[in-house]
Each structure stands twice: as C-alpha cells, then as structure tokens.
Amino acid sequence: MLHVEMLTLVFLVLWMCVFSQDPGSKAVADRYAVYWNSSNPRFQRGDYHIDVCINDYLDVFCPHYEDSVPEDKTERYVLYMVNFDGYSACDHTSKGFKRWECNRPHSPNGPLKFSEKFQLFTPFSLGFEFRPGREYFYISSAIPDNGRRSCLKLKVFVRPTNSCMKTIGVHDRVFDVNDKVENSLEPADDTVHESAEPSRGENAAQTPRIPSRLLAILLFLLAMLLTL
C-alpha cells in the first residue's frame, strides 16, 4: 500500500511540474550566432539587432586568424553591456560593465565563443537577468584602441512572452549572421531600455517559486504517509 502511494506521489509531482510551466516557454531554444568583427556587414550598417525570447541564446564568436597573419593585423575587442545612452554614444565608461574579452586571435582551438542565455533568473552574483519587452545593448572597444573610433554595437530585444510561440523538438535552432536579416518585430513605443547592471543582492539568489497548488498537494500526501 505504501508503495502505491509513493508512486502516486511521484506521478502527481511530475504532472504538476509539467503543467505549471510558463505557457510562453519553449521546448527548443533558438541560438543566434554573431561574428564580432569589423568585416561583418551587419555591424557596418550600424543597426545590428536581433529579437530573442526568454531562454534563447546569443553566441558571440571572436575574430580568429591563421598563424601567418601578423599580430598588428588582427582584431581584439573588449565587449561591454551598456545602457541606452552608452549604446547611442558607443561609450562604456559612464554606465556599463565588461562582459567578455576577445584577446586570442590565434587560438589553436578556433575562435573564442561566448554565450549569453536570456533567462529570467540567474544563480550567479555577476550574472544578468532579462525581462520580456525590454532592450539590451552590447558594444565593444578595440584592443589596443590606437585612437580608432570604430564602434561595433548590437541591440537585443527580448520579445514579450505572448509573442514567443511554443516549439516542439529536441535540438537548438541556430541562426548565423545571414539569417533573419529582416526583423519584422520592432519594439513598441512602451519598450523599456534596460539599465546595464549585473544582478546583485536578493535578485541574484531568486529562483522560480514553487506553485502553491503543488506545495499543498505535497504537504497533504506527506501527512497521509506519516499516518500509516
């Protein structure tokens, strides 16, 4: 009898976990590949932007060269996350923080890749939490600067939850620099420009809350088992 009730408990827990998920979440995450170098035509236009959903990924690929290319001909960058003003002026000094550093152009293992997951919650004190309906901004500065003012910048719009359709599958979909050139979803007038600050304090330790129905069922079944 106890064995049957334990199986029932496990079944109910699994059922509640499945059906208590956010309806806007996706079974498959999209990955957006961005090649961070000055020869990328989308950076040259100055309006490079992508639209993502919560739980999607941004994969940034650093410049990479053959060994025959001299050091002074390679590109190196420090990438920053900034606010809207920093994005507009391409200035990370006023309001921004360092995200990644592309400093190994001759890496023997291929180009350096950095990934950003657009998640609502992060367990890391220096991680970043993203919100649907808001814009986020990345810029870079060259290493060394040498007085050059070339500005590479990227704008990311996190779509509202209701515009992210559920997807069924088992593999991530990958979009490279030539995919999704036309972006049909432009931010609405009420789009919020998110301030570039890493999550700290209370927000850094947040995790999705357990649904109250699930907690009540677990407590009820636990009480039943204790009375046996």
Swiss-Prot record:
SUPFAM superfamilies: Cupredoxins (SSF49503). Residues 204-228 form a propeptide. Pfam families: Ephrin. Disulfide bonds join 62-102, 90-151. It is a lipid-anchor; GPI-anchor. Residues 186-205 are annotated as: Disordered. One of its GO terms (biological process) is positive regulation of phosphatidylinositol 3-kinase/protein kinase B signal transduction. Keywords: Cell membrane, Developmental protein, Differentiation, Disulfide bond, Glycoprotein, GPI-anchor, Lipoprotein, Membrane, Neurogenesis, Signal. Residues 1-20 form the signal peptide. Glycans are attached at residue 37. Residues 190-200 have a biased composition (Basic and acidic residues). The keyword Disulfide bond applies. A lipid is attached at residue 203 (GPI-anchor amidated asparagine). PROSITE patterns: EPHRIN_RBD_1 (PS01299), EPHRIN_RBD_2 (PS51551). Coiled coil: none annotated. One of its GO terms (cellular component) is plasma membrane. Residues 29-162 form the Ephrin RBD domain. It is found in: Cell membrane; Membrane, Caveola. Belongs to the ephrin family. Binds to EPHB2. Interacts with EPHA8; activates EPHA8. Binds to the receptor tyrosine kinases EPHA2, EPHA3 and EPHB1. Forms a ternary EFNA5-EPHA3-ADAM10 complex mediating EFNA5 extracellular domain shedding by ADAM10 which regulates the EFNA5-EPHA3 complex internalization and function. Cell surface GPI-bound ligand for Eph receptors, a family of receptor tyrosine kinases which are crucial for migration, repulsion and adhesion during neuronal, vascular and epithelial development. Binds promiscuously Eph receptors residing on adjacent cells, leading to contact-dependent bidirectional signaling into neighboring cells. The signaling pathway downstream of the receptor is referred to as forward signaling while the signaling pathway downstream of the ephrin ligand is referred to as reverse signaling. This is Ephrin-A5.
